[in-house]
C-alpha cells in the first residue's frame, strides 16, 4: 500500500448531464445566486467533456443534507458545525474533500474563529452580556458553536428550564442568528435584516447570513460584535486603513489588531468540507470533478468563470472565495475524526447539562478490543463504580480512532501501535512494568522500564530450521503492526531481502490484520465456528502472543514470533488451557540471528531485538486525569491491590493478556510527559518508519492528513 500523498487543488460549481447518471455529480445549492453559479460551472464542464454535473436547488443546508442522504443530490460544501450534523444519524454523511486556505507555500486545512469589534468600543470578551451580537448562523462553527461554547460559563443556563438558545437570547440584548426559529426566539432574530419570511432565514435571503453577512451586521452598526473567521475582515475590507478600524477580542480579555489572529482567536476550526454519502457516495467521481475544475478554473486561472469567486455583491457561493483549492480526505476519516476531539468536546458542552459535562470529565472511558476485552472491561467498570467505563472496537486501530474522536480516553498498546497512536497525536501516559531482577528494591511505579525480548520460537524437533532457512516456511504472528510479532521480524527480513513482498517470503502465515484473502491469513482459524478468520482481536484463535504460540504448538506453523515470556507463560504447567497444559519448555528452541539455535532459557543471548514496554496512551489534554485515575485503580485492583484477587484484578485474564499483559506488576510513571518518539527510542522509531515505507495503514494515512 502506498503512502498517502496529498493533492492540492481548486474547485467550482457544478453542471448538468442526465445521459449517464452514474457519471454525474448532483451538487446541492441553497440560493438563486448559488444555483446560477452552479449552472455556469455545469456549462463549462460540459464543454470540457469532463465529469458532468447537475445543479439541485434546496432552501437551506439541512435540506441539502437530507437530499444527499435520500440520493436526490450527491455533494455540498459545509462548515464544521454542519459537517458534524451531517455525520449523525440518520444522515451518516462523511467529508470527502477539505477546502485549503493560507498560501500555496503554506496551505492549511483549518481557519481561526474570531470575535470582531469596532475599534474604540470599550468592552472585552468577558463583558459581552447585554451587547448586540452578529452570528453567521445557528450551529455553525465560527458563528455559534465556538463562541457560545466559550461564553457558556457566563450564560447562567439552567438546562432543565430552557433550551440553550433561550439562555443566549437573555445574555445578549439583541442578536442576528440566522437559522434560529424566530417565533420561539424573536430576540435572536431582532437584528436580522431580511424582509418578511426571509428575516433570519438560513440562506443568503437573509442579508446578515454567513461570514460576510455577520460582518455587515457589525459594519452597519446593528451589532457590537461579529463572530466570524479570520479572513472575513480581509475579504470585506481590502484596504488596511479600513481594517484598522476593527479589532479582535482575545481569550485573555485583551484586544489585538485584526491581523494578529494567530495570537488572538477563539479556536482553530477544521476547514469547510465537501460531504457525500458514506455508502455509494460517488467519492471518486466527485474528486475527479474537483480535480478537473481546479485544473481549468482554479485559483489564478484566467477566464470569465472562477471556481473560488463570486459576482459583485455576493460572497462564498458554493465554496469560500478565499479557498486555494481542495485536499482529498482519506476514506478512514469520518466526520468525527475530521472535526477532532476538541471541536467535538465544544459541541458536547453545548448539548449536555452541566452535570453531564462534569460526569464526562470525571470518568475514564477505556477502549476494549474485541468481545473478550469488552467482558473484562465491563467487570472493571462495575467494580470501579463507573469511574471507568468502556467503549469497544473490533481492532486496535479503531480504538485509537475512538480516542482521537473523544469517544474513549485510553488503552494500553504495544510499541508498534504506540508508533501509530503517536503519529496521530496521542501521548504515552503510563508504562506496563514487569518484575525486575535489576531494580527489585525500587517501587514498581517509579522503576524504569526495561523493555522485553522479541524472539523467534520453533519446535526442538524441527532440527534443520534456523533464522537463515525461514524462507518458504509457515509463520505465526501476534498481529500486523505489533512489535514482537510483526514489526521486528518483518523489518529484519525486509532489510535482509530488500523486498516488501511479505506475503511471498513465507509459504503460509497467520498474521491477524492482514488481507484475509492473502497467504498471510492462510493459517488463521477464526473463532470456534470458523468465523472472523484473521481478525486482529481475540475472536481469532491465533491472535496475540498466546495465539501465535498456540499456532506453533498445534503444528500449524513452523515458527512463532512472540516475546520471550510467552513460552514461559504457556509451558510446564503455567497455563491450564487444554492446548497448553501438557507443553514442555524443553521442546522449544529460539532462533538466533547468527543462524544458531538455543534453549528458551537463553533469550538474553538469543533474541531478535529488545522491544519497548507496552504503554497506556491518551490525548494530551486528558493524560493527567487518565494517569490519576489509573494509579488509583491499580491501588485497588493491581497485583498488590486491596481488592485483588477478591473482587477484580487488572493484570489477570480468563484467557491471556486482556486490556493489559498478565505479567504486568504495575503501571509505572514515565517521568515527565515524553513524546511517543522519546518513549519508543530513536532506533525503534527509525526501524518502524522504514518498515512503513513498505506499507502504511488507513489510520496512518488518515492521521497524516489530520496532523498536516
Swiss-Prot record:
The active site is at residues 92, 278. SUPFAM superfamilies: Periplasmic binding protein-like II. Its EC number is 3.4.21.-. Disulfide bonds join 28-64, 38-55, 134-217, 176-192, 179-202, 189-200, 250-264, 367-399, 377-390, 424-703, 444-666, 476-551, 500-694, 510-524, 521-534, 592-606, 644-649. Keywords: Disulfide bond, Glycoprotein, Hydrolase, Immunity, Ion transport, Iron, Iron transport, Metal-binding, Osteogenesis, Protease, Repeat, Secreted, Serine protease, Signal, Transport. Hydrogencarbonate 1 binds at residues 136, 140, 142-143. One of its GO terms (biological process) is antifungal humoral response. Poly-N-acetyllactosaminic carbohydrate moiety seems to be needed for TLR4 activation. The keyword Cell inner membrane does not apply. PROSITE patterns: TRANSFERRIN_LIKE_1, TRANSFERRIN_LIKE_2, TRANSFERRIN_LIKE_3, TRANSFERRIN_LIKE_4. Glycans are attached at residues 252, 300, 495, 564. One of its GO terms (cellular component) is plasma membrane. The gene is LTF. It is found in: Secreted; Cytoplasmic granule. Gene3D superfamilies: Periplasmic binding protein-like II. This is Lactotransferrin.
Amino acid at each position: 500500500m502506498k503512502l498517502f500523498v496529498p493533492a492540492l487543488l481548486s474547485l467550482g460549481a457544478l453542471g448538468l448531464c442526465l445521459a449517464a447518471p452514474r457519471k454525474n455529480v448532483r451538487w446541492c445549492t441553497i440560493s438563486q445566486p448559488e444555483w446560477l453559479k452552479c449552472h455556469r460551472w455545469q456549462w463549462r464542464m460540459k464543454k470540457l467533456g469532463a465529469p458532468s454535473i447537475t445543479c439541485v436547488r434546496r432552501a437551506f443546508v439541512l435540506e441539502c443534507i437530507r437530499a444527499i442522504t435520500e440520493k436526490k443530490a450527491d455533494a455540498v460544501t459545509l462548515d464544521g458545525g454542519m459537517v458534524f450534523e451531517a455525520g449523525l444519524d440518520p444522515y451518516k454523511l462523511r467529508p470527502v474533500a477539505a477546502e485549503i486556505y493560507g498560501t500555496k507555500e503554506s496551505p492549511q486545512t483549518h481557519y481561526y474563529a474570531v470575535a470582531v469589534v469596532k475599534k474604540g468600543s470599550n468592552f472585552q470578551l468577558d463583558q459581552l452580556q447585554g451587547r448586540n451580537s452578529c452570528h453567521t448562523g445557528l450551529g455553525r462553527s465560527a458563528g455559534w458553536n465556538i463562541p457560545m461554547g466559550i461564553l457558556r460559563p457566563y450564560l447562567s443556563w439552567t438546562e432543565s428550564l430552557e433550551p440553550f438558545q433561550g439562555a443566549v437570547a437573555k445574555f445578549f440584548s439583541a442578536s442576528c442568528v440566522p437559522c434560529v426559529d424566530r417565533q420561539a426566539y424573536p430576540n435572536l432574530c431582532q437584528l436580522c435584516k431580511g424582509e418578511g419570511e426571509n428575516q433570519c432565514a438560513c440562506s443568503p435571503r437573509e442579508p446578515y447570513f454567513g461570514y460576510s453577512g455577520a460582518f455587515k451586521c457589525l459594519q452597519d452598526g446593528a451589532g457590537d460584535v461579529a463572530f466570524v473567521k479570520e479572513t472575513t475582515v480581509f475579504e470585506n475590507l481590502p484596504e488596511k486603513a479600513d481594517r484598522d478600524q476593527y479589532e479582535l477580542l482575545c481569550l485573555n480579555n485583551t484586544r489585538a489588531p485584526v491581523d494578529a489572529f494567530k495570537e488572538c482567536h477563539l479556536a482553530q476550526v477544521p476547514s469547510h468540507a465537501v460531504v457525500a454519502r458514506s455508502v455509494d457516495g460517488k467519492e471518486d467521481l466527485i474528486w475527479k470533478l474537483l480535480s478537473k475544475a481546479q485544473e481549468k478554473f482554479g485559483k489564478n486561472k484566467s477566464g470569465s468563470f472562477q471556481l473560488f469567486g463570486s459576482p459583485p455583491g455576493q460572497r462564498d457561493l458554493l465554496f469560500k472565495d478565499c479557498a486555494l483549492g481542495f485536499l482529498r480526505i482519506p476514506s478512514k476519516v469520518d466526520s468525527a475524526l475530521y472535526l477532532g476531539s476538541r471541536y467535538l468536546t465544544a459541541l458536547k458542552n453545548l448539548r449536555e447539562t452541566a452535570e453531564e459535562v462534569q460526569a464526562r470529565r470525571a470518568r475514564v472511558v477505556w477502549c476494549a478490543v474485541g468481545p473478550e476485552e469488552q467482558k473484562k472491561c465491563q467487570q472493571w467498570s462495575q467494580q470501579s463504580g463507573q469511574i471507568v467505563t468502556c467503549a469497544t472496537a473490533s481492532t486496535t486501530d479503531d480504538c485509537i480512532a475512538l480516542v482521537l474522536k473523544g469517544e474513549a480516553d485510553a488503552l494500553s498498546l504495544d510499541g508498534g501501535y504506540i508508533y501509530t497512536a503517536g503519529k496521530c497525536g496521542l501521548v504515552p501516559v503510563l508504562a506496563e512494568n514487569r518484575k525486575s531482577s535489576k531494580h527489585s528494591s525500587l517501587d514498581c511505579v517509579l522503576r524504569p522500564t526495561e523493555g522485553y525480548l522479541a524472539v523467534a520460537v520453533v519446535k526442538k524437533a524441527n532440527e534443520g530450521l534456523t533464522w537463515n532457512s525461514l524462507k518458504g516456511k509457515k509463520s505465526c504472528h501476534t498481529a500486523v503492526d505489533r512489535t514482537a510479532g510483526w514489526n521486528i521480524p518483518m523489518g529484519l527480513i525486509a532489510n535482509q531481502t530488500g523486498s516488501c513482498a511479505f506475503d511471498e517470503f513465507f509459504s503460509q502465515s497467520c498474521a491477524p490484520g492482514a488481507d484475509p484473502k492473502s497467504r498471510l491469513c492462510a493459517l488463521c482459524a477464526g473463532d470456534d465456528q470458523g468465523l472472523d478468520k484473521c481478525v486482529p482481536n481475540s475472536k481469532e484463535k491465533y491472535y496475540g502472543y498466546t495465539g501465535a504460540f498456540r499456532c506453533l504448538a498445534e503444528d500449524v506453523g513452523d515458527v512463532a514470533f512472540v516475546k520471550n515470556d510467552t513460552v514461559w507463560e504457556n509451558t510446564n504447567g503455567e497455563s491450564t488451557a487444554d492446548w497448553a497444559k501438557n507443553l514442555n519448555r524443553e521442546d522449544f528452541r529460539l532462533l538466533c540471528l547468527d543462524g544458531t539455535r538455543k534453549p528458551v532459557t537463553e533469550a538474553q543471548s538469543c533474541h531478535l531485538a529488545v522491544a519497548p514496554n507496552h504503554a497506556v496512551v491518551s490525548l494530551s489534554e486528558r493524560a493527567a486525569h487518565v494517569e490519576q485515575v489509573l494509579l488509583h485503580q491499580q491501588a485497588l485492583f493491581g497485583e498488590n491491590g486491596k481488592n485483588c484477587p477478591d473482587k477484580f484484578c487488572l493484570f489477570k485474564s480468563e484467557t491471556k493478556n486482556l486490556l493489559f499483559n498478565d505479567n504486568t506488576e504495575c503501571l509505572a510513571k514515565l517521568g515527565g510527559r515524553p513524546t511517543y518518539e522519546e518513549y519508543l527510542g530513536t532506533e525503534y522509531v527509525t526501524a518502524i518508519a522504514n518498515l512503513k515505507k513498505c506499507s502504511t495503514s488507513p489510520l496512518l494515512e488518515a492521521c497524516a492528513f489530520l496532523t498536516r
